[in-house]
């Protein structure tokens, strides 16, 4: 429900009503405190797709992955006086090896397509698609981070941004490929996502 409320801010972000969007995110945070994590990205994801701000977000993600041990020590120190003070020790105690790399790759598909087909996005000049691309970049960055830290804790955060992929991916298919290619790709994706769904069920012992 918290993720749905944050996603409902989309029309407000497009109309640049950031105050109202902030209030809704704060409301979502009363349902789940992690919704506050989405607040800075209200401002970071403004502007054209793949702009400097979103690229600057990816830089610290890469640095964290390269220096993961130092990052976890700093994170543990920062969370010491909060309700999340045991997060780092918990994911180490649970032997949490991070988000499965296949899951990271699957959720990164819309982001990768947006980079490959950036000229189509630039030509369309649609603020909604620009927003969706930037949210998708954030989602992918956090998923990459979760692959090297915690799938249980960090791996849950992308839900606030990955919902935009449900707008972005269909747009990419219909604007970047020919009609015949779209049909073939749609069938292939249905098969692959079905496989991915059952793979997820099996991974969690539900199948």
Region annotations inferred by a language model:
Residues 9-10, 20-44:
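Membrane-interface alpha helices of multi-pass inner-membrane proteins
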Residues 45-157:
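Alpha-helical transmembrane segments and terminal signal-anchor/GPI-anchor hydrophobic tails
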Residues 59-60, 178-198:
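Signature aromatic-anchored transmembrane alpha helix within multi-pass, membrane-resident enzymes
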Residues 15-19, 171-185:
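Membrane-interface junctions at the ends of membrane-embedded or membrane-associated helices
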Residues 153-171:
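Hydrophobic/aromatic-rich transmembrane helices and adjacent perimembrane loops
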């Amino acid at each position: 429900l918290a993720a749905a409320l944050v996603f409902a801010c989309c029309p407000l972000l497009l109309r640049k009503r950031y105050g109202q969007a902030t209030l809704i995110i704060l409301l979502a945070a009363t349902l789940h405190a992690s919704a506050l994590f989405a607040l800075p990205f209200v401002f970071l994801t403004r502007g054209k797709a793949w702009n400097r701000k979103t690229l600057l977000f990816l830089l610290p993600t890469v640095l964290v992955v390269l220096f993961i041990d130092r990052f976890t020590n700093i994170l543990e120190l920062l969370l010491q006086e909060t309700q999340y003070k045991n997060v780092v020790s918990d994911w180490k105690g649970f032997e949490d090896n991070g988000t499965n790399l296949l899951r990271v790759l699957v959720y990164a598909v819309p982001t990768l397509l947006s980079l490959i087909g950036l000229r189509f996005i630039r030509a369309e000049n649609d603020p909604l698609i620009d927003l969706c691309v930037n949210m998708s970049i954030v989602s992918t960055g956090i998923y990459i981070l979760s692959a090297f830290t915690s799938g249980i804790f960090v791996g849950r955060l992308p839900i606030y941004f990955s919902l935009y992929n449900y707008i972005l991916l269909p747009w990419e298919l219909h604007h970047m490929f020919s009609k015949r290619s779209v049909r073939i790709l749609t069938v292939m994706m249905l098969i692959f996502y079905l496989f991915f769904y059952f793979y997820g069920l099996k991974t969690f012992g539900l199948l």
